[in-house]
């Protein structure tokens, strides 16, 4: 048994915590080299303000605290409060909240990071995609994110394509975690797109108008993406270009409720339509 796994089990026993993979997705990282890579990928400096979601037993948290100006932690499982208070005695720059990150609206940090289950990661991205305070994030998620992103047939994949540049940093074998999960993990980095092309503006509009029917969001997204072109599209022209997309049953749903097949058709249009690719001011 490696030392970090032994330390993990020791702390769990000390604080009388039994990991709960079902309700909280708790699989603790017990591979020390990956903790170092995670902290390094966060690129924190002594001026950095960091938001960490789900600190676990605090191994990554302490690595960040040694480098950053401050670290604010959100932990939904109240069993970890005593552990966090003990870490706070050692690191005065730690702030924590025993609450659900999805109820938080402040993402004005230099780095947002955490090891997250898919059940939290997708809702988190839905919450922060329109929040321009979010600039850079480092996350451990399921390795299936790479396949999902490549297939571009999910809300998560299109959200990432529209608003972020993604880097797949490191595949994490499931044996790196305790208790061992059913699938491998993936360390990723997300950076908000600064230069937005007409092509990506089209996708962004779909989500920024997510409360509208998909066919209306598609039409308005296409019109808005043409603003820097020689000719700004009319509603009639955009409907004609979108063709069957606006006639399919899913087009009457919000983009967040559309089927995988419809989302893939949107991505195919995104790939094939002749956007000018100009960078918007």
Which role fits each region the language model picked out?
Residues 1-205, 256, 262-281:
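Catalytic cores of RNA-modifying enzymes
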Residues 183-271:
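An accessory alpha-helical subdomain
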């Amino acid at each position: 048994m490696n030392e970090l796994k032994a330390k993990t089990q020791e702390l769990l026993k000390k604080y009388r915590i039994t990991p709960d993979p079902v309700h909280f997705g708790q699989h603790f990282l017990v591979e020390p080299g990956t903790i170092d890579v995670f902290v390094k990928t966060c690129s924190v400096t002594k001026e950095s303000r960091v938001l960490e979601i789900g600190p676990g037993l605090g191994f990554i948290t302490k690595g960040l605290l040694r480098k950053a100006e401050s670290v604010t932690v959100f932990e939904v499982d109240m069993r970890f409060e005593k552990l966090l208070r003990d870490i706070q005695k050692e690191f005065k720059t730690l702030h924590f909240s025993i609450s659900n990150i999805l109820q938080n609206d402040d993402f004005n940090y230099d780095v947002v990071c955490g090891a997250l289950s898919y059940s939290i990661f997708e809702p988190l991205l839905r919450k922060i995609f329109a929040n321009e305070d979010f600039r850079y994030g480092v996350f451990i998620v399921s390795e299936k994110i790479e396949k999902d992103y490549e297939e571009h047939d999910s809300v998560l994949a299109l959200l990432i394509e529209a608003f972020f540049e993604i880097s797949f940093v490191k595949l994490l074998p499931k044996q790196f975690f305790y208790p061992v999960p059913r699938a491998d993990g993936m360390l990723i980095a997300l950076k908000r797109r600064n230069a937005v092309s007409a092509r990506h503006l089209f996708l962004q509009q779909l989500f920024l108008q997510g409360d509208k029917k998909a066919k209306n969001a598609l039409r308005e997204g296409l019109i808005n993406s043409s603003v820097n072109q020689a000719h700004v599209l009319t509603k009639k022209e955009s409907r004609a270009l979108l063709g069957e997309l606006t006639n399919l049953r899913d087009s009457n749903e919000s983009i967040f409720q559309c089927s995988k097949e419809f989302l893939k058709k949107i991505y195919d249009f995104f790939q094939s339509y002749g956007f000018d690719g100009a960078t918007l001011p």
